[in-house]
């Protein structure tokens, strides 16, 4: 039978662990990074332009199908991977979302994405988004990631 003091000590330890975990998530963790990853802060208005070229070429080579197994030459992927590596890890999906879907900035400026510009003829919006998400897969660019495999979804955007 546990004593009341043992239960109190256990509760205090659990509370301390939860407090430390919450503080770690808020400080440099992967909590709410929305403000940090906005266009004009960690994400530029024209993020990862080499990835735009790579996705457009991938659409052409693959005939508009993500599952075709056909991909552009590796030397076209390498500049894209370098640009993605320069984006903070927790902002990569946001940068790719801006690239694919575009965004309306806080100032009200519209930044068009690949979908609205029809920058990848032959690929529909879902395929373009899938190809962009696949760029964050470890096997593609060998980038460290936040724990997700690819970008689980693109939020917001204009398209």
UniProtKB/Swiss-Prot annotation:
Predominant location of this chain? secreted
Q: Where is the signal peptide?
A: 1-24
Does this entry carry the keyword Signal? yes
Among Pfam families, the record links this protein to:
Tryp_alpha_amyl (PF00234)
Q: Where in the cell is it found?
A: Secreted
Task: Give the GO molecular function terms.
Answer: IgE binding; nutrient reservoir activity; serine-type endopeptidase inhibitor activity
Keyword set for this entry?
Answer: Allergen, Disulfide bond, Secreted, Seed storage protein, Signal, Storage protein
Q: Which CDD domains match?
A: AAI_SS
Q: Which InterPro entries match?
A: Allergen/soft/tryp_amyl_inhib, Bifun_inhib/LTP/seed_sf, Bifunc_inhib/LTP/seed_store
- Cysteines engaged in disulfide bonds, as pairs: 37-91, 51-80, 59-123, 81-141, 93-151
The protein's role, per its UniProt record: Seed storage protein.
Q: Please state what the protein is called.
A: 17kDa alpha-amylase/trypsin inhibitor 2
Lineage runs:
Eukaryota, Viridiplantae, Streptophyta, Embryophyta, Tracheophyta
């Amino acid at each position: 039978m546990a004593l009341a003091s043992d239960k109190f000590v256990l509760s205090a330890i659990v509370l301390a662990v939860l407090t430390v975990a919450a503080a770690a998530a808020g400080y440099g963790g992967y909590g709410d990074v929305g403000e940090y990853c906005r266009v004009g802060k960690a994400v530029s208005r024209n993020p990862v332009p080499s990835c735009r070229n790579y996705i457009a070429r991938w659409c052409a080579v693959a005939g508009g199908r993500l599952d075709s197994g056909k991909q552009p030459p590796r030397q076209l992927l390498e500049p894209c991977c370098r640009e993605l590596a320069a984006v903070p890890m927790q902002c990569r999906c946001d940068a790719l979302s801006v690239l694919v879907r575009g965004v309306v900035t806080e100032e009200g400026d519209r930044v068009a994405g690949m979908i609205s510009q029809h920058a990848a003829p032959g690929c529909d919006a879902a395929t373009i988004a899938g190809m962009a998400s696949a760029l964050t897969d470890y096997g593609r660019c060998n980038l460290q990631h936040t724990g997700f495999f690819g970008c689980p979804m693109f939020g917001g955007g204009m398209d």
